[in-house]
């Protein structure tokens, strides 16, 4: 990036820093002035300072040249906010302050205006600590204090004490803002909804500022005052922007369709590798466009969204980048992986809440989505197809892991391809928190780029172009790009079946796999904010906040839900999960994850899950396939469901948790834990009766009465009162309805698995 764009980025990102200082000190003057004065104390950069000081329409200066960057920051702020702020007051205005400003309000939940129902939930005033418990929104209103803001202001000032405001430190400041300002509301106007954080608004303002700069530069227009201030309403009509997106296809097959007993060791490495590939695709594209991560709205699960300038150069760069990266994928993965880019132009009016319609907002995303879909149908041009066909069938053996026939080598007594050999090495590095991009050392991740995990203390010894850090914010000297990764791992995959046994050696020796994802997330993303207020809440800032909320839940907090459980998170995208572990802990994890997800989204979104039960030597590909079928069975049950072990045991989530997991299973444990082996053997007879109820209903009721009487005789005298309660309860389950019988059958089966001795 050239110096002018770097200054523009910092000015746009810091334009509202005065709000933090103003709330900390209570100063009664424009936040733009407060922010600029504060900045001048810590840095010597007049261009950045002027953007902070003059980014408000009612505080422009005749001293500014027509080509001053402050005009770009001004209109970018308006677009990011979704309103034209020429007529707005602010917190320091004496007349308006008492009436409309709630200076210390805490941030509202993004899901308050999501879906059809309006809610009032708020976040606790805090920083974003990735190691602490999730900051769940609640109905409790707990405002900030001056002291809270003073602590935030002090931390920012301390972090920026040695800051150079150059290109190398851009990611550091983005990290700092996300860590400190994610629960600080951008607007405290009581007539607005304070659900957009200052971190998100500042980031989006910087994104639009950089895109506007490129757009006007391309057209040779440098009278920013005229174009962006005097004639701002005309600029809002110009299709100055592109919403660009990419989709990386083949992720599921790449991770799960692997053979051999040693493949399990690669499983997490393959997943993490593709996570970083998506990150690298995004960063590489931004580098080529002379942009940074402010322009990246979202990345995760093989998808990403960007705000870019609508110029021929941008489109040419997208086309060439897509071509080059697919050449890399073809050379290393043949047709197993493919990346498709899509984009669509839009004007500021299409995303500004006072000017847009829900339909125009959806169309922005649909343009990009349609282009991607068309490319995925027809992936390769004629020349590429001819080259692929000319290769014919290789005479070499297949890679014993991924079945590739290209570039095979011998490694650990196996015939493997170069990529799988690299993944073996990478699997030893995934415990590190830092991952570097080098030119030629490590696992190929893009054209002339390799990925390598490195211990923190050895970073200074390495040569790299970029460093990523997992689940941690690093500002200052490290200059790292943080990435969210769901990577909890208790033990090696092959050990989980044995770990299903308790300390007494009881429990069926099986592992379990869960696959789950959010129901109808695509529709929710495009239209979730359109159902209230005639679509006025459909804004880019809310879409970006929504996406980051999903990433935070599924890539960070998921590690906490898994902690202390015997399982490994293999894959956690922005909305879907694949995990392997002891079968008891996989069920417990799924229940905990689902209940926390309902709490996180206030019940506005649901998820569906399939859980499969397998012997420890079952091929990964088979486990993934069969569990995927169970997930589909859950989706087929009108979603918000779980399918456990077999599609026969498919329940609505609430029904499974309330009636089976927390009730019937507990009742069965309470009684049968006091029975000897003879008593426990009757469980199989009870299961058989439940399964055969329809065949001979009257006869089976009589058999049940007989079995329960025999079971009572085997029960110790001091336990018989307890048994009578169970007898009455079970008879009710059996005779009540099919739902109760199916729930009782699964509860008994789960208990049998808990007490098996094999």
UniProtKB/Swiss-Prot annotation:
Its EC number is 3.1.-.-, 2.7.7.-. Residues 1-82 are annotated as: HD domain. Residues 509-647 form the GGDEF domain. The keyword RNA-binding applies. Keywords: Antiviral defense, ATP-binding, Endonuclease, Exonuclease, Hydrolase, Nuclease, Nucleotide-binding, RNA-binding, Transferase. Pfam families: Cas10-Cmr2_palm2 (PF22335), Cmr2_hel_dom2 (PF20824), Csm1_B (PF18211), HD (PF01966). Belongs to the CRISPR-associated Cas10/Csm1 family. ssDNase activity is activated by target RNA binding to the Csm-crRNA complex and is inhibited by EDTA. It catalyses: 6 ATP = cyclic hexaadenylate + 6 diphosphate. The keyword Disulfide bond does not apply. It comes from the Bacteria. Encoded in a type III-A CRISPR locus. One of its GO terms (biological process) is defense response to virus. Changing residue 16 to A: Dramatically decreased ssDNase activity. Wild-type synthesis of cOA. InterPro entries: Cas10-Cmr2_palm2 (IPR054767), Cas10/Csm1 (IPR013408), Cas10/Csm1_subtype-III-A (IPR052117), Cmr2-like_C (IPR048693), Csm1_B (IPR041062), GGDEF_dom (IPR000160), HD_domain (IPR006674), Rev_trsase/Diguanyl_cyclase (IPR043128). One of its GO terms (molecular function) is endonuclease activity. It comes from Streptococcus thermophilus. The lineage of its organism: Bacteria, Bacillati, Bacillota, Bacilli, Lactobacillales. Its cofactor is a divalent metal cation. CRISPR (clustered regularly interspaced short palindromic repeat) is an adaptive immune system that provides protection against mobile genetic elements (viruses, transposable elements and conjugative plasmids). CRISPR clusters contain spacers, sequences complementary to antecedent mobile elements, and target invading nucleic acids. CRISPR clusters are transcribed and processed into CRISPR RNA (crRNA). Csm functions as a non-specific ssDNase. Base-pairing between crRNA and target RNA to form a ternary Csm complex activates a ssDNase activity; target RNA cleavage suppresses the ssDNase, a temporal control that prevents uncontrolled DNA degradation. Viral RNA transcripts probably tether the Csm complex to the viral genome, recruiting Cas10 ssDNA activity which is able to degrade DNA in the transcription bubble, spatially controlling the DNase activity. The N-terminal HD domain has ssDNase activity. The C-terminal GGDEF domain has the cOA synthesis activity. This is CRISPR system single-strand-specific deoxyribonuclease Cas10/Csm1 (subtype III-A). Degradation of ssDNA requires Mn(2+), Co(2+) or Ni(2+); Mg(2+), Ca(2+) or Zn(2+) do not activate ssDNase activity. Formation of cOA requires Mn(2+), Co(2+) or Zn(2+), Mg(2+) is not as efficient. CDD domains: Cas10_III. Part of the Csm effector complex that includes at least Cas10(1), Csm2(3), Csm3(5), Csm4(1), Csm5(1) and mature crRNA. The Csm complex is elongated and slightly twisted with a maximal length of 215 Angstroms and a diameter of 75-80 Angstroms. It has been modeled to have a central protein filamant of Csm3 subunits along which the dsRNA helix of paired crRNA and target RNA binds. The filament is capped at one end by Cas10 and Csm4 and at the other end by Csm5; ssDNA is thought to bind to the N-terminal HD domain of Cas10.
């Amino acid at each position: 990036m050239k110096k002018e764009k770097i200054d523009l980025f910092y000015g746009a990102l810091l334009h509202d820093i005065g709000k933090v200082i103003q709330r900390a000190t209570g100063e009664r003057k424009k936040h733009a002035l407060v922010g600029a004065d504060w900045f001048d104390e810590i840095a010597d950069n007049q261009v950045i300072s002027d953007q902070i000081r003059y980014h408000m329409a009612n505080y422009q200066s005749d001293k500014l040249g027509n080509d001053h960057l402050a005009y770009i920051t001004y209109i970018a702020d308006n677009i990011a906010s979704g309103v034209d702020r020429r007529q707005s007051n602010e917190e320091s205005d004496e007349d308006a302050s008492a009436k409309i400003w709630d200076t210390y309000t805490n941030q509202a939940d993004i899901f308050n205006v999501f879906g059809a129902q309006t809610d009032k939930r708020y976040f606790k005033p805090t920083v974003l600590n990735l190691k602490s418990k999730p900051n769940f929104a609640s109905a409790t209103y707990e405002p900030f204090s001056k002291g809270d803001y003073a602590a935030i202001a002090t931390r920012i000032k301390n972090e920026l004490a040695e800051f150079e405001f150059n290109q190398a430190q851009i990611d550091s400041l983005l990290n700092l803002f996300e860590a400190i300002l994610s629960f600080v509301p951008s607007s405290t106007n009581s007539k607005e909804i304070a659900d957009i954080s200052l971190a998100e608004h500042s980031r989006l303002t910087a994104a639009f500022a950089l895109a506007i700069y490129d757009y006007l530069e391309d057209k040779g227009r440098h009278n920013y005052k005229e174009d962006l201030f005097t004639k701002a309403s005309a600029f809002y009509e110009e299709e100055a922007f592109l919403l660009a997106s990419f989709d990386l296809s083949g992720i599921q097959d790449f991770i799960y369709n692997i053979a051999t007993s040693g493949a399990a060791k690669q499983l997490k490495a393959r997943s993490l590798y593709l996570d970083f590939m998506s990150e690298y695709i995004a960063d590489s594209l931004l580098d080529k466009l002379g942009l940074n991560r402010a322009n990246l709205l979202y990345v995760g699960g093989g998808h990403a969204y960007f705000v870019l300038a609508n110029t021929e150069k941008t489109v040419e760069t997208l086309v060439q980048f897509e071509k080059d990266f697919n050449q890399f994928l073809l050379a290393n993965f043949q047709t197993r992986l493919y990346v498709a880019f899509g984009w669509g132009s839009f004007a500021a009016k299409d995303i500004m809440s006072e000017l847009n319609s829900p339909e125009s907002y959806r169309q922005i995303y649909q343009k990009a989505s349609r282009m991607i879909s068309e490319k995925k149908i027809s992936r390769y041009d004629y020349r590429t197809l001819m080259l692929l066909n000319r290769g014919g069938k290789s005479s070499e053996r297949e890679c014993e892991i991924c079945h590739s026939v290209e570039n095979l080598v011998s490694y650990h007594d196996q015939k493997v391809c170069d990529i799988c050999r690299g993944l073996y090495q990478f699997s030893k590095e995934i415990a590190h928190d830092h991952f570097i991009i080098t030119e030629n050392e490590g696992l190929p991740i893009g054209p002339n780029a390799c990925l390598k995990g490195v211990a923190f203390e050895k970073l200074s010894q390495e040569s790299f172009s970029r460093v990523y850090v997992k689940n941690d914010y690093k500002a200052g000297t490290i200059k790292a790009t943080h990435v969210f990764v769901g990577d909890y791992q208790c033990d090696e995959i092959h050990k989980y079946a044995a770990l299903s046994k308790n300390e007494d050696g009881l429990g069926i020796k099986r592992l379990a796999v869960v696959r789950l994802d959010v129901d109808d997330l695509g529709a929710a993303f495009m239209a979730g904010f359109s159902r209230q207020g005639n679509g006025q809440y459909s804004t880019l800032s809310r879409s970006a906040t929504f996406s980051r909320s999903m990433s935070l839940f599924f890539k960070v907090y998921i590690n906490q839900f898994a902690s202390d459980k015997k399982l490994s998170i293999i894959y956690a995208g922005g909305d879907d999960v694949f995990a392997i572990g002891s079968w008891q802990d996989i069920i417990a994890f799924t229940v905990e994850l689902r209940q926390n997800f309902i709490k996180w989204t206030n019940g506005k979104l649901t998820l569906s899950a399939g859980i499969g039960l397998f012997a420890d030597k079952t091929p990964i590909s088979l486990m993934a396939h069969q569990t995927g079928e169970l997930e589909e069975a859950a989706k087929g049950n009108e979603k918000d469901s779980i399918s456990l072990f077999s599609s026969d045991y498919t329940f609505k989530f609430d029904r499974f948790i309330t009636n089976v997991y927390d009730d019937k299973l507990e009742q069965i444990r309470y009684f049968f834990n006091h029975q000897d082996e003879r008593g426990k053997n009757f469980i199989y007879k009870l299961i058989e009766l439940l399964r055969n109820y329809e065949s001979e209903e009257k006869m089976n009721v009589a058999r049940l009465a007989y079995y329960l009487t025999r079971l009572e005789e085997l029960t110790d005298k001091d336990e018989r009162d307890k048994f009578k309660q169970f007898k009455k309860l079970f008879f009710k389950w059996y005779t009540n309805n099919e739902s109760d019988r199916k729930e009782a059958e699964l509860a008994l089966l789960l208990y049998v698995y808990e007490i098996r001795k094999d």
